[in-house]
Amino acid sequence: WYLYDEAGNLKTGWCLQGNTWYYLDGENTEHPGMMAADQIKEINGKYYGFDASGAMQTGWILREEGWYYAQVDGAFVNGWNNIGGAWYYLDGNNAEHPELMVAGQQKVIDGTTYFFAESGTMKSGWQQYPEGWYYATPDGAKIYGWRNINSEWYYLDENNTEYPGLMVNDPEKTIDGTTYYFNADGAMIRGWKQYPEGWYYQDPSGVRATGWRRVDGAWYYLDGDNEEYPGLLVTDCSKVINGVTYYFDKAGAMREGWYAENGAWYYYNESGQPASGWKNVNGTWYYLDPQNNNKMVSGGWKVVNGSWYYFNGSGAMAKNWLAAGSDWYY
């Protein structure tokens, strides 16, 4: 199409017909003044889109290669733009298709990597790809290194040469000389974690604990000298540690206070050692018989250091008046 004025002169440049703008291309050397149609055209350093009828387009414009966005004056936007409450990036550095919307990819922009959905919207938060997970901040920037997300620690591996920033979910990984342990969902393990060989404990920093740890009011020993499984929790046994014997229950807790075994009761002091002889517990006297492996005496008479004492069924030493059969004792 061409347009001539009333005098028969060929018109070129912008032309408003009704409410619609058209462009008559005076620089078309083969067909000067031909109306631009069904194309993207650079005019005075700006890009414009025209539909098949030649009408200048505004808003979102779909072409075979993807989407563009034009302002109300028809000029394509480039760079970051918030459209309809979402962020898009129209790539002015795309040599083949200038100002084409970035979609369905990771893209480095001014040194920072961003994620874009197939719809072109910038994404934030967790992003899943075939190789695994990445994370982007609320402003869209891909992050690297340690990150606390919803009170859990994750490591986005900046040293992964194939997939920089990929979330680590290996069972263990050495980072800056320290070994850390991760769940399958990528969260750094803190606290107790069970493996086929037994239990381990990771400190709040994520470092596997060795030696003594007090957890929820109980003492545990993580055996750093276990050559096969360093840091494995000691359970259900006695163990000599620094020349002192300690006793551990099936859950690994060091025995403290009353402990029942094979129908007999024993008492372990706060240091983890079995009490022997007389023991006052909460104002009540008990006798842990050193001649019988420190078992608590209960339910009868017992001579201690030449004197007779009576212990009831709970092991408590009787005081004041005591009826035994038809006899009374004091």
Go through the PLM ranges and name each one.
Residues 1-330:
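Extracellular adhesion/carbohydrate-binding repeat motifs centered on closely spaced tryptophans
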